[in-house]
């Protein structure tokens, strides 16, 4: 079970890293990846892979949706940690995005993640 979960975490993180590595290098990419990739159990991704396997959905399609869901989840966590919300200093054992970069950068990075999700899904749908 743990081995399968680790594989899903690695597969999802690698997919997201490759996607963001192909994007134009802006000042937001680093804080977006910081809030998105390290740590986290990717439970949502595992649930999607489990449901997809039940209904025999192509794993590449599941991976695209899982990556999109992780973008939305990371957005919610980045915003939840902000001073106007919970004002947390740590997330997953490391500085929160607003503590590592700045509050305004965290807001913009968080806001950019759902947009990236939309672009990711549209790009994959059109390309494949």
Predicted regions and their residues:
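Single conserved hydrophobic/aromatic residue that forms the stacking wall/gate
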Residues: 119-128
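Short alpha-helical patches at coil-to-helix transitions and adjacent helical residues
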Residues: 41-45, 107-114
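Short glycine/serine- and small hydrophobic-enriched flexible loop segments
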Residues: 49-53, 73, 115, 119-120
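Conserved N-terminal diphosphate/IPP-binding helix and adjacent helical/loop segment
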Residues: 1-69, 78, 84-85, 91-92
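Hydrophobic positions within alpha-helical membrane elements
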Residues: 85-86, 116
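Divalent-cation-assisted or electrostatically stabilized phosphate/pyrophosphate-binding catalytic cores
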Residues: 88-112
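Acidic-residue sensor for enzyme active/binding pockets
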Residues: 70, 103, 124
